[in-house]
Protein backbone atom coordinates (compact mmCIF):
# COMPACT_ATOMS: atom_id res chain seq x y z
CA UNK A 1 0.00 0.00 0.00
CA UNK A 2 1.30 3.45 -0.93
CA UNK A 3 2.46 5.75 1.85
CA UNK A 4 0.02 8.59 2.54
CA UNK A 5 2.32 11.51 3.34
CA UNK A 6 1.38 14.81 4.92
CA UNK A 7 2.49 16.55 1.72
CA UNK A 8 0.07 14.43 -0.34
CA UNK A 9 -2.81 15.22 2.01
CA UNK A 10 -1.90 18.92 1.87
CA UNK A 11 -1.91 18.90 -1.94
CA UNK A 12 -5.33 17.22 -2.08
CA UNK A 13 -6.72 19.74 0.41
CA UNK A 14 -5.40 22.63 -1.69
CA UNK A 15 -6.86 21.16 -4.88
CA UNK A 16 -10.29 20.29 -3.49
CA UNK A 17 -10.78 22.53 -0.45
CA UNK A 18 -12.03 19.50 1.50
CA UNK A 19 -11.19 18.74 5.13
CA UNK A 20 -8.02 16.97 6.22
CA UNK A 21 -9.76 13.77 7.40
CA UNK A 22 -11.76 13.51 4.15
CA UNK A 23 -8.60 13.96 2.07
CA UNK A 24 -6.68 11.35 4.03
CA UNK A 25 -9.54 8.86 3.75
CA UNK A 26 -9.86 9.47 0.01
CA UNK A 27 -6.12 8.91 -0.50
CA UNK A 28 -6.16 5.68 1.50
CA UNK A 29 -9.08 4.38 -0.57
CA UNK A 30 -7.29 5.41 -3.78
CA UNK A 31 -4.01 3.81 -2.62
CA UNK A 32 -2.23 7.16 -2.79
CA UNK A 33 -3.39 8.05 -6.33
CA UNK A 34 -4.34 11.72 -5.96
CA UNK A 35 -6.13 11.96 -9.31
CA UNK A 36 -8.26 8.91 -8.49
CA UNK A 37 -8.95 10.38 -5.05
CA UNK A 38 -10.22 13.60 -6.66
CA UNK A 39 -12.43 11.64 -9.07
CA UNK A 40 -13.89 9.62 -6.20
CA UNK A 41 -14.52 12.78 -4.18
CA UNK A 42 -16.32 14.36 -7.12
CA UNK A 43 -18.51 11.27 -7.50
CA UNK A 44 -19.39 11.24 -3.81
CA UNK A 45 -20.29 14.92 -3.78
CA UNK A 46 -17.38 15.98 -1.55
CA UNK A 47 -15.78 17.88 -4.41
CA UNK A 48 -19.06 19.72 -4.91
CA UNK A 49 -18.96 20.65 -1.26
CA UNK A 50 -15.37 21.77 -1.67
CA UNK A 51 -16.31 24.14 -4.49
CA UNK A 52 -18.63 25.94 -2.09
CA UNK A 53 -15.90 26.33 0.53
CA UNK A 54 -14.65 29.64 -0.83
CA UNK A 55 -18.03 31.33 -0.57
CA UNK A 56 -18.82 33.60 2.36
CA UNK A 57 -20.96 31.96 5.05
CA UNK A 58 -22.11 34.88 7.19
CA UNK A 59 -25.66 33.79 8.06
CA UNK A 60 -26.59 30.95 10.39
CA UNK A 61 -27.61 30.22 13.96
CA UNK A 62 -26.39 30.50 17.54
CA UNK A 63 -27.46 27.67 19.86
CA UNK A 64 -27.10 27.41 23.64
CA UNK A 65 -26.98 24.48 26.03
CA UNK A 66 -26.77 24.43 29.83
CA UNK A 67 -25.10 21.64 31.81
CA UNK A 68 -24.17 21.15 35.46
CA UNK A 69 -22.18 24.26 36.36
CA UNK A 70 -21.43 25.27 32.78
CA UNK A 71 -23.00 26.40 29.53
CA UNK A 72 -21.97 26.31 25.89
CA UNK A 73 -22.70 28.47 22.84
CA UNK A 74 -22.21 27.17 19.30
CA UNK A 75 -22.24 29.17 16.07
CA UNK A 76 -22.91 27.41 12.78
CA UNK A 77 -22.87 29.44 9.56
CA UNK A 78 -24.37 29.21 6.09
CA UNK A 79 -24.65 31.63 3.17
CA UNK A 80 -28.30 32.70 3.32
CA UNK A 81 -30.95 33.34 5.94
CA UNK A 82 -33.22 30.96 4.02
CA UNK A 83 -30.90 28.00 4.63
CA UNK A 84 -30.42 29.12 8.26
CA UNK A 85 -34.06 28.08 8.74
CA UNK A 86 -33.76 24.81 6.78
CA UNK A 87 -34.66 21.74 8.85
CA UNK A 88 -31.52 19.87 7.78
CA UNK A 89 -29.22 22.76 8.67
CA UNK A 90 -30.93 23.43 12.01
CA UNK A 91 -30.91 19.70 12.77
CA UNK A 92 -27.17 19.43 12.22
CA UNK A 93 -26.55 22.57 14.29
CA UNK A 94 -28.53 21.03 17.15
CA UNK A 95 -26.50 17.82 16.88
CA UNK A 96 -23.31 19.88 17.16
CA UNK A 97 -24.62 21.76 20.21
CA UNK A 98 -25.72 18.54 21.92
CA UNK A 99 -22.30 16.99 21.28
CA UNK A 100 -20.54 20.08 22.66
CA UNK A 101 -22.69 19.84 25.81
CA UNK A 102 -22.04 16.11 26.26
CA UNK A 103 -18.30 16.55 25.64
CA UNK A 104 -17.43 19.59 27.74
CA UNK A 105 -14.33 21.45 26.63
CA UNK A 106 -14.35 20.14 23.05
CA UNK A 107 -12.28 22.44 20.82
CA UNK A 108 -13.67 23.97 17.65
CA UNK A 109 -11.21 21.87 15.63
CA UNK A 110 -12.45 18.66 17.27
CA UNK A 111 -16.08 19.65 16.65
CA UNK A 112 -15.36 20.39 13.01
CA UNK A 113 -13.61 17.05 12.54
CA UNK A 114 -16.41 15.16 14.32
CA UNK A 115 -19.09 16.53 11.99
CA UNK A 116 -17.14 17.07 8.76
CA UNK A 117 -18.72 14.13 6.93
CA UNK A 118 -22.25 15.27 7.78
CA UNK A 119 -21.41 18.90 6.96
CA UNK A 120 -19.99 18.00 3.54
CA UNK A 121 -23.01 15.82 2.74
CA UNK A 122 -25.40 18.63 3.67
CA UNK A 123 -23.43 21.15 1.58
CA UNK A 124 -23.68 18.79 -1.39
CA UNK A 125 -27.42 18.37 -0.83
CA UNK A 126 -28.37 22.01 -0.22
CA UNK A 127 -25.74 23.68 -2.41
CA UNK A 128 -24.52 26.27 0.09
CA UNK A 129 -21.27 26.57 1.97
CA UNK A 130 -21.65 26.07 5.72
CA UNK A 131 -19.32 25.62 8.66
CA UNK A 132 -19.11 25.19 12.40
CA UNK A 133 -17.42 28.47 13.25
CA UNK A 134 -17.20 28.93 17.02
CA UNK A 135 -17.81 27.19 20.34
CA UNK A 136 -17.62 28.98 23.71
CA UNK A 137 -17.85 27.41 27.15
CA UNK A 138 -18.60 29.25 30.39
CA UNK A 139 -18.40 27.85 33.92
CA UNK A 140 -20.08 29.23 37.02
CA UNK A 141 -22.17 28.60 40.10
CA UNK A 142 -25.32 29.71 38.27
CA UNK A 143 -25.55 29.91 34.47
CA UNK A 144 -28.28 31.84 32.67
CA UNK A 145 -28.82 31.91 28.92
CA UNK A 146 -30.59 34.21 26.50
CA UNK A 147 -31.11 33.73 22.76
CA UNK A 148 -32.34 36.61 20.62
CA UNK A 149 -33.99 34.67 17.83
CA UNK A 150 -31.15 32.42 16.78
CA UNK A 151 -28.89 35.34 15.86
CA UNK A 152 -27.45 36.38 19.25
CA UNK A 153 -26.60 34.08 22.14
CA UNK A 154 -25.49 35.05 25.64
CA UNK A 155 -24.37 33.07 28.68
CA UNK A 156 -23.98 34.78 32.06
CA UNK A 157 -22.25 33.17 35.04
CA UNK A 158 -22.68 34.41 38.59
CA UNK A 159 -24.49 34.10 41.90
CA UNK A 160 -28.15 34.74 42.61
CA UNK A 161 -31.48 33.81 41.05
CA UNK A 162 -31.24 32.49 37.50
CA UNK A 163 -34.19 34.67 36.40
CA UNK A 164 -32.31 37.80 37.49
CA UNK A 165 -29.16 36.72 35.66
CA UNK A 166 -31.26 36.05 32.55
CA UNK A 167 -32.35 39.71 32.59
CA UNK A 168 -28.68 40.65 32.67
CA UNK A 169 -28.06 38.25 29.76
CA UNK A 170 -30.72 40.15 27.80
CA UNK A 171 -28.87 43.38 28.62
CA UNK A 172 -25.59 41.88 27.35
CA UNK A 173 -27.31 40.91 24.09
CA UNK A 174 -28.51 44.49 23.57
CA UNK A 175 -25.60 46.55 24.92
CA UNK A 176 -22.49 44.49 24.01
CA UNK A 177 -20.26 45.21 27.03
CA UNK A 178 -16.61 44.17 26.72
CA UNK A 179 -15.83 43.66 30.42
CA UNK A 180 -17.70 42.73 33.61
CA UNK A 181 -16.59 45.66 35.83
CA UNK A 182 -14.95 49.05 35.15
CA UNK A 183 -11.83 47.89 37.00
CA UNK A 184 -11.56 44.92 34.62
CA UNK A 185 -10.85 47.17 31.62
CA UNK A 186 -7.29 46.33 30.59
CA UNK A 187 -4.48 48.84 31.03
CA UNK A 188 -3.80 48.65 27.29
CA UNK A 189 -7.38 49.62 26.42
CA UNK A 190 -7.36 52.44 28.99
CA UNK A 191 -4.02 53.79 27.73
CA UNK A 192 -5.19 53.77 24.12
CA UNK A 193 -8.45 55.57 24.94
CA UNK A 194 -6.65 58.13 27.14
CA UNK A 195 -4.27 58.92 24.28
CA UNK A 196 -7.22 59.43 21.92
CA UNK A 197 -9.10 61.64 24.39
CA UNK A 198 -6.03 63.82 25.09
CA UNK A 199 -5.54 64.27 21.35
CA UNK A 200 -9.21 65.29 20.97
CA UNK A 201 -8.95 67.80 23.82
CA UNK A 202 -5.71 69.31 22.49
CA UNK A 203 -7.18 69.57 18.98
CA UNK A 204 -9.93 71.73 20.48
CA UNK A 205 -7.25 74.22 21.56
CA UNK A 206 -6.70 73.15 25.18
CA UNK A 207 -3.13 73.13 26.61
CA UNK A 208 -1.82 69.63 27.36
CA UNK A 209 -2.00 70.11 31.16
CA UNK A 210 -5.67 71.12 31.03
CA UNK A 211 -6.42 68.44 28.43
CA UNK A 212 -5.02 65.74 30.73
CA UNK A 213 -7.23 66.90 33.63
CA UNK A 214 -10.30 66.94 31.39
CA UNK A 215 -9.56 63.42 30.22
CA UNK A 216 -9.65 61.90 33.73
CA UNK A 217 -13.40 62.51 33.93
CA UNK A 218 -13.91 61.17 30.44
CA UNK A 219 -11.95 58.01 31.27
CA UNK A 220 -14.21 57.19 34.22
CA UNK A 221 -17.18 57.52 31.88
CA UNK A 222 -15.45 55.38 29.25
CA UNK A 223 -14.68 52.44 31.57
CA UNK A 224 -18.30 52.51 32.72
CA UNK A 225 -19.61 52.49 29.15
CA UNK A 226 -17.59 49.41 28.12
CA UNK A 227 -18.24 47.38 31.29
CA UNK A 228 -21.40 45.45 32.15
CA UNK A 229 -21.90 46.72 35.70
CA UNK A 230 -21.19 50.33 34.69
CA UNK A 231 -23.77 50.48 31.90
CA UNK A 232 -27.33 51.83 32.35
CA UNK A 233 -29.59 48.77 32.71
CA UNK A 234 -31.71 48.37 29.54
CA UNK A 235 -34.78 47.40 31.59
CA UNK A 236 -34.39 50.42 33.89
CA UNK A 237 -31.95 53.06 32.55
CA UNK A 238 -32.26 55.05 35.78
CA UNK A 239 -29.82 52.61 37.40
CA UNK A 240 -26.69 50.77 36.32
CA UNK A 241 -26.53 47.01 35.91
CA UNK A 242 -24.27 46.96 38.98
CA UNK A 243 -26.89 48.75 41.07
CA UNK A 244 -29.59 46.42 39.80
CA UNK A 245 -27.56 43.32 40.66
CA UNK A 246 -26.98 44.67 44.16
CA UNK A 247 -30.71 45.32 44.61
CA UNK A 248 -31.58 41.69 43.80
CA UNK A 249 -28.64 40.25 45.76
CA UNK A 250 -26.91 38.86 42.69
CA UNK A 251 -23.51 39.20 41.02
CA UNK A 252 -21.86 38.36 37.71
CA UNK A 253 -18.47 36.69 37.40
CA UNK A 254 -18.30 36.41 33.60
CA UNK A 255 -20.30 36.38 30.39
CA UNK A 256 -20.02 35.25 26.78
CA UNK A 257 -21.82 36.84 23.81
CA UNK A 258 -21.87 35.49 20.25
CA UNK A 259 -23.61 37.07 17.27
CA UNK A 260 -24.06 35.32 13.94
CA UNK A 261 -21.51 36.40 11.37
CA UNK A 262 -19.74 39.01 13.52
CA UNK A 263 -16.31 39.70 12.09
CA UNK A 264 -17.17 38.15 8.71
CA UNK A 265 -17.13 40.55 5.79
CA UNK A 266 -20.19 39.92 3.64
CA UNK A 267 -19.76 40.21 -0.11
CA UNK A 268 -22.73 42.08 -1.54
CA UNK A 269 -23.49 42.86 -5.17
CA UNK A 270 -26.48 44.66 -6.62
CA UNK A 271 -28.85 42.58 -8.72
CA UNK A 272 -28.12 44.41 -11.99
CA UNK A 273 -24.37 43.84 -11.60
CA UNK A 274 -24.95 40.16 -10.87
CA UNK A 275 -27.13 39.73 -13.99
CA UNK A 276 -24.56 41.58 -16.10
CA UNK A 277 -21.82 39.27 -14.83
CA UNK A 278 -23.83 36.14 -15.67
CA UNK A 279 -24.82 37.35 -19.16
CA UNK A 280 -21.45 38.86 -20.00
CA UNK A 281 -22.99 42.32 -20.05
CA UNK A 282 -25.65 41.33 -22.60
CA UNK A 283 -28.71 41.57 -20.38
Curated annotation (Swiss-Prot):
GO terms for molecular function: translation elongation factor activity. GO terms for cellular component: cytoplasm. SUPFAM superfamilies: Elongation factor Ts (EF-Ts), dimerisation domain (SSF54713), UBA-like (SSF46934). The keyword Signal does not apply. Residues 80-83 are annotated as: Involved in Mg(2+) ion dislocation from EF-Tu. It comes from the Bacteria. It is found in: Cytoplasm. Keywords: Cytoplasm, Elongation factor, Protein biosynthesis. The keyword Protein biosynthesis applies. Pfam families: EF_TS. Associates with the EF-Tu.GDP complex and induces the exchange of GDP to GTP. It remains bound to the aminoacyl-tRNA.EF-Tu.GTP complex up to the GTP hydrolysis stage on the ribosome. NCBIfam families: tsf. Belongs to the EF-Ts family. This is Elongation factor Ts. It comes from Glaesserella parasuis serovar 5 (strain SH0165).
Amino acid sequence: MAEITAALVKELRERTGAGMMECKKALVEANGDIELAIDNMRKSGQAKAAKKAGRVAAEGVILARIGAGFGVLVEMNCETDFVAKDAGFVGLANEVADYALANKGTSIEALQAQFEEKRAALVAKIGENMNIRRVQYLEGQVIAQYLHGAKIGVLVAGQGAEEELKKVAMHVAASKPDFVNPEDVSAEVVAKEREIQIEIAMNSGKPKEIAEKMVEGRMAKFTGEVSLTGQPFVMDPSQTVGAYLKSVNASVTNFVRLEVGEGIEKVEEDFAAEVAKITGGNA
